[in-house]
Amino acid sequence: MLAKLLCHKFFQKSLTHLHKARTKTLLDCGDALIHGNKLTLTSIGRHLHGSAHVKHKIKRVDRFLKNKYLYQEQVEIYKAIIQPIIANLSYLAIAIDWSGCCTHKYHLLRASLLVDGRSITIFNMVVEQNDLESRDKHSLFLKQLNQIIGEHQRIYIVTDGGFLTPWYSEVISLGWHVVGRVRGTMKCYIEKKGQWKTLKELHVEASTTPATLGKARLTQHSPTACDAYLHLYHGEAKGRKGKSRFTKDTKMYQNLAKEPWVLSSTDEMLNSEQVVKIYMKRTQIEQNFRDDKSQRYGFSWRFSQSNTVERISILCLIAFVGSMALWFI
């Protein structure tokens, strides 16, 4: 009870400039989510505190999910809660990745702060299937993320191989650094060697000791080509031979795990060991997604039948508040 009281005091202090009734309902829904453990309209309504009949509680949550003012100020809510946490950090390592969301019609783009243990969600953006990985949504996401975290001494955006040079260019334009994995058929111009190399050719040079290739030009013909510093690393086998949880039809996942890392960093001050250490933490965002989706240990995200971007976005906001409360505890 004391931990819950302290969490509420933190949230109320952070959200003092926002609408009091909406703030109260948001915190009440966060509590209900923690007790009910299902990110659905009916479960949250059933576990709301108070003497009202269950049907009225569910209607209250329904009205909350379609509140257009709350949807418009969600960036301000993320900012108000996150700012006190990141204010005194010397640098920010932020993992960004896509995930499926409730149904196959919607997807989530999430930014998570990489720390010791579980990462902390900073911002969620829900989009429809047609906008998955679109450049416009990437630009909007980075713009809103910039509003949330504000000015900071050093910011590293950590991404996997699905984010290509257009993304790098967007991040660099904000004055941030990228730490990411380079994959696919891309060619890189290695300044030290004075020649273009395919990633497969670079894989041969990788070992269990992180090594740098120096400055390189990413992509040969793309208009968004950019410069970065490349690092090689091939981790030791995990000793799971013959115990894969994947079927023979999904060899792709096994090959991805065995493939050496070609990591890129736009910060020349980072050495290979530091780049590998930062990138290794990227898997924390996958744990973040599992915390929301797991039907046994998480918020059972898949049970939600909400079917608009606005309603799902507010459900994600409720999950964010619930996760933050559990993280504090």
Question: What annotation goes with each model-predicted range?
Answer:
Residues L33, G50, N67-Y71, G100, ...:
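Short secondary-structure transition/capping motifs
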Residues M1-K38, I77, L89-L92, V115-I329:
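Single, function-defining residue in the core of a domain
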Residues R22-K59, R63-L65:
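A structured, charge-rich N-terminal accessory region that forms the first stable segment of a protein
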Residues I58-D116:
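Active-site-proximal, Lys/Arg-enriched surface segment
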Residues G50-Q74, Y233-R245:
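Short N-terminal secondary-structure initiator segments
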Residues L33-G36, S51-H53, Q83-I86, G100-C101, ...:
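Short secondary-structure boundary/capping segments within folded domains
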